[in-house]
Amino acid sequence: MTQHDRQQFKNSLIQSTKYFKIKLENEPIFNWNDTAVGSKAITSEGKTVWLRIQCGNCDDIKNNHTWSGEIDASSLENILKSNLIDYYNWQDKDVCWRALLLSYIDENFCSTHPILTDSKFLLSVKWLDELKKNLVVLSKYKTNRISITQEDVDKKIKKTFNIQVDTTITNWVTIHGDLHLANLTYPSLYILDWEVWGNGPLGYDPALLLAFSADNFDVVDKIREVFKDWLLTREGKIVQLFALAEVLNIAKFDSQFSRLEKPIEQMSKKIMNELVEKN
């Protein structure tokens, strides 16, 4: 993202404060890949809120479910997440903008990046148990939104690993679809950033969290233990392989993730050997 792009995001934040009648409380905070910006703010009644700005090409977003993800997620109940208060849309030439006013979560992010930025960070089993409870609740929601398809699973595994095994998934549920440590808070759990949620394979969320944490063996072991009924079945291993393939492809082309490449390759090889043995 260029400085000009960042300035446009900042200008949009200021523009949105006038619409919502709020006052920014801190400098704008960009997400890890610079696709959105947010800031803590105060309403005229003195309530603390979070203002988030996102944008996209107007033609591209017409059939892109990520554009409506946060708004659609406002229907989800009994899940620890931020709540949508209001939103505001506008268009500037061929770019569509959206400002989302969300409830403020007064917790720390587990990490400022999908991979751990603090080598001493430890997740507790209690926290992971709470995460699982929330994912179970989410899994039971009915939605027309699609996060991952069978075709996605088949193509990604075949292209990345060229393994000849049946990759059919039969257990499809509603998932978050982008579960990593930059979208989770600690010590109290909240699940953030709901752009891509929808139908997907059971176990994908913890599998993706595991893949992004591949170089932290303590975190990996705890995720596998808490989610063993989802991850250690045959289908669970297929889902793990798919998530590992996704992150491995990122690691090969983005230096920010390069340290994950070796541990993911080791994990993937072990899972492939297990799948071939049982095939």
Model-derived regions, located:
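Active-site Asp-x-Gly
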Residues: 174, 185-229
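A conserved long alpha-helix in the C-terminal portion of kinase-like catalytic domains
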Residues: 210-279
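Conserved kinase catalytic-core helix
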Residues: 69-81, 101-149, 177, 270-274
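A conserved alpha-helical element in kinase catalytic cores
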Residues: 6-19, 50-98, 119-129, 133
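A glycine-centered beta->alpha junction motif in the catalytic cores
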Residues: 56-57, 90-124, 140-144, 241-258
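Hydrophobic, aromatic-enriched interface-forming segments
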Residues: 126-188
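Active-site beta-strand-loop-beta-strand hairpin of nuclease catalytic cores
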Residues: 42-49, 185-190
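Short Lys/Arg-enriched alpha/beta "domain-start" segment
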Residues: 1-33
